[in-house]
A protein has these predicted regions:
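Low-acidity, Ser/Thr- and Arg-rich intrinsically disordered low-complexity segments
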Residues: 2-3, 12, 16-29
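Hydrophobic, membrane-interfacing alpha helices
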Residues: 29-316
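Absolute N-terminal positional cue centered near the fourth residue
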Residues: 3-4, 22, 38, 301
Length: 316
C-alpha cells in the first residue's frame, strides 16, 4: 500500500470487505480475490475547524463557482455593450436564485417525504442537498424577471449567461468529490475510487464525469459563438448550452448510484420505465425538459435569426 496523501491511497481491496459494507448483488461480478489497486479516497470534508465554526471544501468550491460564474458573466456583459452596474445588479438576484432554487429542487425532487414531515429542514443548508436542476430552474426564472425589469429580451440575457454557468458548475462537482457524495455505481474500471467514508466498494467517480461536462460544454459554446452562426440574443447559445449540458447529464446519470428515487416511483414515470424496459433515474427525467427546451431555442434561432456576419456587413 502506498502512503496516504491528503487521505488518498492506492491499495488492493478484498471483495469480502466490499461485501461487508456494500450491496452483495452490486459487487457479485467482482473476483473473490483482491481488487486491482483502486484509489482510496478518505479525505475529511472539513478543511479547518475553528471552535464551533468549520470551513468545508464544499463551501470553498461553492464560493469559487459563484466567483467564476460572475467573472464570466461580467466580462461577457461588458463585451456586448452593457454597463458594469447592469452586470453587478444581477449578482443580487442570481446568488439567491442559485441557493433557493438548488435547495428547493433537492427537497422537492429527491427527498420530499423528509421535508414534508419537517419543513424547517429546508433551511438546514449545512446538512447539504442542492440540486443542479433546481439551480437551473431558479436561474431561468430570475433571468426572465431581470429581463422584464431592464427591458431586455430573455434570450439575450440567457446567451450572456450560459457560458458562465458552463464554466462554473464544475466547482460544485469538486465539492461533491470532497464530500464523498453523488458517488458512482460499483465498478471494476482502472480509475475506480473507493469512497472510504461511504463504504469500501470501488465505484465510478461520477462527480468527476460530471466535472468534465461543464468545460466541454463551455468549449462548444465558444466554438458556436466564434462561427458567427447567429447574433447574441437569438437564443442559440442558451439553446446549445441546454442541449449539450443536459444531454450529457442524461448519459452520465447512468453511472451514478442512487439512494433516493421518489420521482421515478410516481405512476406515470414508473409506467414509462416499465414500457421501455430499462431504468430511467430521477436526474435523467429532470434533464429531458431542458434538452427539449434547448432544441426548441436552437430551432427558433435558426429559423428566425440572421448571421452575425450579415449584420456586420450591413453596418459597414
Amino acid at each position: 500500500m502506498r502512503p496516504a496523501i491528503l487521505g488518498v491511497t492506492t491499495q488492493s481491496v478484498p471483495a469480502t470487505y466490499c461485501m461487508s459494507r456494500g450491496n452483495a448483488a452490486s459487487v457479485a461480478r467482482f473476483s473473490s480475490g483482491p481488487m486491482p489497486n483502486p484509489i482510496v479516497w478518505n479525505v475529511d470534508p472539513v478543511l479547518v475547524r475553528l471552535g464551533p465554526l468549520t470551513v468545508r471544501y464544499y463551501g470553498i468550491c461553492f464560493g469559487l463557482a459563484l466567483a467564476t460564474g460572475f467573472a464570466v458573466w461580467f466580462t461577457r456583459v461588458r463585451r456586448f455593450g452593457e454597463s458594469a452596474a447592469f452586470a453587478e445588479q444581477f449578482l443580487y438576484f442570481g446568488v439567491p436564485a442559485v441557493i433557493i432554487g438548488g435547495r428547493l429542487g433537492y427537497c422537492f425532487f429527491y427527498a420530499p417525504q423528509i421535508y414534508l414531515a419537517n419543513p424547517l429542514r429546508v433551511f438546514a443548508l449545512w446538512q447539504g442537498g442542492i440540486a443542479s436542476h433546481g439551480v437551473a430552474a431558479g436561474l431561468a426564472i430570475t433571468l426572465w424577471a431581470f429581463s422584464r425589469r431592464h427591458h431586455i429580451t430573455w434570450t439575450r440575457l440567457s446567451d450572456y449567461f450560459a457560458p458562465a454557468v458552463a464554466l462554473s458548475v464544475g466547482w460544485i462537482r469538486v465539492g461533491n468529490f470532497f464530500n464523498s457524495e453523488v458517488i458512482g455505481r460499483p465498478a471494476s474500471v482502472p480509475w475506480a475510487v473507493v469512497f472510504a467514508r461511504h463504504d469500501l466498494v470501488p465505484r465510478h467517480p461520477a462527480q468527476l464525469y460530471d466535472l468534465l461536462i461543464g468545460p466541454f460544454t463551455y468549449l462548444v459554446l465558444l466554438a458556436v459563438e466564434r462561427r458567427n452562426i447567429r447574433p447574441i440574443g437569438s437564443g442559440l447559445i442558451a439553446g446549445t448550452f441546454l442541449t449539450v449540458y443536459f444531454g450529457l447529464r442524461i448519459f452520465v446519470e447512468q453511472y451514478k448510484d442512487f439512494y433516493v428515487e421518489q420521482l421515478r416511483e410516481m405512476p406515470p414515470f414508473r409506467s414509462i420505465e416499465q414500457w421501455l424496459g430499462f431504468p430511467i433515474h430521477t436526474g435523467q427525467w429532470l434533464s429531458v425538459l431542458p434538452v427539449l427546451a434547448g432544441m426548441f431555442l436552437i430551432g427558433r434561432a435558426m429559423r428566425s435569426g440572421v448571421r452575425l456576419s450579415e449584420i456586420a456587413r450591413t453596418n459597414h
